[in-house]
Amino acid sequence: REPPGGVILDPKGDYGQKIRLLCEKYGRASDLVVIDPFDQRRSIRWNPLDSDDDELELASRFGAVLESLGMSGGENTFWIDAAQRVIRHSISLLRFTNPANEPPSFRDIQSLVSSFAAIADRTDQLDLSNPGVEPCLSFFGEWMDMAPNQRSGIQTHVTNMLDPFLMEPYATAFSGTSTIRIS
């Protein structure tokens, strides 16, 4: 199956019905894929972190979402950039330590951001002979040594970015292995 040609955010559901009718009219109803957290039977599962894109690209998407929501500019830029950085390195750490074919999850990122024990558990699993783990270890060393007020500010931004994905029904719809890859 080809990847979708576009993604439409339709929280109210009224636009989706119009698109469905249009697809049916042109014989393309089978090409329409839907992410509907409230109706898992008709929905695909899509984990935005289940992607071959690098960690920087994935984290940058979250920053772009915050900017589109009007959270950019001025003093927020520092916090958004810092949040993207911790998300990027969290994705990297999860990719190094998750079982094969298990993509990172928002819940695991939140756990790393909020718990030194979770970081220690994951970093203890790293293969230190792999030179790719060094930036990840270095970042989390800085994270643990960071001034508590600064770390708390970053944690707040990350929590605000991830929170919707941690609650049902979104936690199920946007986790695990994706039904199809969108990106």
Model feature map: region roles:
Residues 1-183:
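P-loop NTPase motor domains
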